[in-house]
Amino acid sequence: GCNVQTVAAQDVQDGRFPTVASPNPENPPALAMAIEQADASGADIVIATDPDADRMGVAVRGEDGKMHLLTGNQIGSLLAWYRCMSMSELGIINDSNRSRAVMVKTFVTTGLQDAIGHHCGYEVVNVLTGFKYIAQKLGKYEEAIPAEKRRDYRRMSEEQTRALRLQYSRYFVFGGEESYGYLAQDFVRDKDANSAAIIFAELAAYAESAGKSLLELLHELFEKFGVYLEMGKSLVMEGADGAAKIAALSASYSANPPAELDGVPVSGIRDFSKGDMVDVEGDPIPAEKMIFVDLADGRSFAVRPSGTEPKIKYYLFGHGKPGEPVKEALPKVQALSLIHI
């Protein structure tokens, strides 16, 4: 079993959340007290959620004895790998039903999860940013089950609904987004930190039983599929003038897409604002002010205005070669990820 500790000062219910500047596990300072306690007690893992338990952040102890914060992309990739591996080892997903297994993620989430899903023989569906789009897919998969079979769907056990989905529809194995939101089941149709924390603890126990650290598991994924690194940048522009600048800047990428960046030719552009795209299942992708730019050297970036804040957001992606030792690949991919916008 696990020796579970909590941070006593953060156990007190207080809507002001006085122990942190922001109770958001995306922000490293939100985990500072827990990491300090982990160092004092010798704990190997820190798991933190936000107050409404939809986002989850994690820190793990490395071979150097220090705690390392994982990104939302890295946490999601470890969870995706563990789910896929478990489904195969338990015989739930096999050659007879593998074509019905699916992962659903957002376009701006790491390609490592695409690689993991495809390696396992699953369909990987990319959707727009926002968990509502993942939830829409889950609703679609439920509706594909014959009506007479799903009449009591909401009262069925996971085993019963899974059998129906594997026979008539799609079985959702894992989904998530880079902003620390994950989902591994169908009965909650939003990002769910509660179930994610349980699965991550199970993953940690698996790693311990295999004599590996979680960082070692992550590096094994990097060596198998290539090192994936992602970065995020935001430009904040407040007020009416700021909103106009954000709109103009966003529109400029569609009207005048770049031909090169950092002296590297652009190899492909995906403009989501036109509303003429479909996903791998043939479903229309709603028009969104987002553009994806792929460079000839393997880098790519996406640009989109935030839907909730006065900022324009950049998502930067770098990918190394499969099979390359992580220690050699990491510096190269880190350099590739530093796109100068």
Indicate residue ranges for each PLM-predicted region.
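C-terminal charged capping/lid subdomain of soluble metabolic enzymes
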Residues: 309-317
